[in-house]
């Protein structure tokens, strides 16, 4: 059942060649999210290892991590914490800078969103180079969170993002891998 399940999820993800630039195979997870059965199965599969455990918060990375994280938080009876691009949150925030392919950006969360020692699952739709997820994890750790896991629907293993999170000592859970492109 496991391998058939992964094929089903993989088939629900649209691949758009040469987007946003030539040579890139863009993995469009919105087609999976738009398919009720596939979205439900993805959420259930990401929730399963943590059901019955104490999870205080689910932190979702802007923007598709909000969609996925909200559903996971609901299933785990946990709170939801948005991790956003700089300047999008209205109250006192904590911020971290991280490197992009062509520069630096910042993400932030509300200063009071996490209490020290809270058990958190970090969520986004996809992990590629891992820069954004690594910055989000460091921000949560800086706030005193205990990160139980980092979860993604899609892994692009050739880009090495998973290894960055594992180097921080974080368990990483993904459902579908697209290798070699």
UniProtKB/Swiss-Prot annotation:
Keywords: Cytoplasm, Glycosyltransferase, Purine salvage, Transferase. It catalyses: AMP + diphosphate = 5-phospho-alpha-D-ribose 1-diphosphate + adenine. GO terms for molecular function: adenine binding; adenine phosphoribosyltransferase activity; AMP binding. It is found in: Cytoplasm. GO terms for biological process: adenine salvage; AMP salvage; purine ribonucleoside salvage. Pathway: Purine metabolism; AMP biosynthesis via salvage pathway; AMP from adenine: step 1/1. PROSITE patterns: PUR_PYR_PR_TRANSFER (PS00103). Coiled coil: none annotated. It holds the Pfam family Pribosyltran. Its EC number is 2.4.2.7. GO terms for cellular component: cytoplasm. HAMAP family: Aden_phosphoribosyltr (MF_00004). Catalyzes a salvage reaction resulting in the formation of AMP, that is energically less costly than de novo synthesis. NCBIfam families: apt (TIGR01090), PRK02304.1-3 (NF002634), PRK02304.1-5 (NF002636). Belongs to the purine/pyrimidine phosphoribosyltransferase family. Homodimer. This is Adenine phosphoribosyltransferase. The gene is apt.
């Amino acid at each position: 059942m496991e391998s058939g399940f992964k094929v089903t999820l993989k088939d629900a993800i649209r691949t758009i060649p040469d987007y946003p630039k030539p040579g890139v195979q863009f993995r469009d997870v919105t087609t999976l999210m738009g398919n009720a059965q596939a979205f439900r199965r993805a959420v259930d599969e990401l929730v399963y290892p943590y059901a019955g455990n104490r999870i205080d918060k689910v932190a979702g990375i802007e923007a598709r991590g909000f969609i996925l994280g909200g559903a996971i938080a609901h299933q785990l009876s946990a709170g939801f914490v948005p991790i956003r691009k700089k300047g999008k949150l209205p109250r006192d925030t904590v911020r971290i800078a991280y490197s992009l392919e062509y520069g630096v950006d910042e993400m932030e969360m509300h200063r009071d969103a996490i209490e020290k020692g809270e058990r958190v699952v970090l969520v986004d739709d996809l992990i590629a180079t891992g820069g954004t997820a690594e910055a989000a994890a460091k921000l949560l750790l800086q706030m005193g969170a205990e990160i139980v896991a980092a979860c993604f629907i899609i892994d692009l293993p050739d880009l090495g993002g998973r290894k960055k999170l594992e180097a921080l000592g974080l368990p990483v859970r993904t459902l579908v891998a697209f290798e070699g492109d």
